[in-house]
Amino acid sequence: MLLGTLQITGEEVRDAEVKAICDSLDDNSIRILSLRGCRVQDEDFKKLMESLKECESLIQLNLNLGVCNGKHRIKWLSEALIVNKCLNSLFLHGTSLGDEGLECLMPSFQVHPKLCSLDLGDCQLGDDGIKQICTLLPSTDGRDGLFELTLSANQNVSPKGWTELAIAIAAKSQLHCLYLDYNNIGDYGAGVFSVALAASSTLEKVDFEGCGIGERGGEMFFTVVANYQTKLDELVLFENNISAELIGQISDCLSHKSQECEERDTDKSHREDNDKAL
């Protein structure tokens, strides 16, 4: 059966539409649901969360731009995720979550067996919130670590919070993609994240656009990409105080390393084919 996708943006979701969505969730006939920026009555939101609990088909849920605002809605979402076992991507970008709201969601995040992509950008998180998120990075019994994490525009996070995240990434992280754009990271943060990038065996893309990083921070990133064997192939540094020349050098270095990796993979594949032929 071909599973459906439903995307509604910035509209009021009325009773008939809510019923249709709940029916699709109950019938396991929907794969992606996006209600980005939509207006949903409390009673209807609760119905959606009840249907989410037992749904076995939905893999991506987008509640960006305030759909989940309010302690009661966060509680209903958490209760749904405790039961749900199939969702792997949850987008809450632009939710008035704060550290307290995240704390309410954490028990469901920590036990969910398949949740691997999480967007908490512009969610008013602080250092306590970052500390909680760090617990989701390593794999545990019954749960893989996060594969993709978005923390854009959480400007209440201090250097201490970013340092904790960098340590968690360097230690046991499974992250492949990390989006930190439009945060107050600066050269100090660039330094601690440089250590994380050098230590990570999984990170492939990191976004530091508009993070107040200067030439000194850019030089630390260049040191990593030029001298350490990592899987990193994209480092976004636009809208910082880093010279175009240095950004170009970093980009060239990443491109060269990516080409070398492709050549190694091709050689390995050829060797394996030859071994099978023998």
Segments (PLM) and residue ranges:
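Leucine-rich tandem repeat or coiled-coil scaffolds
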Residues: M1-L278
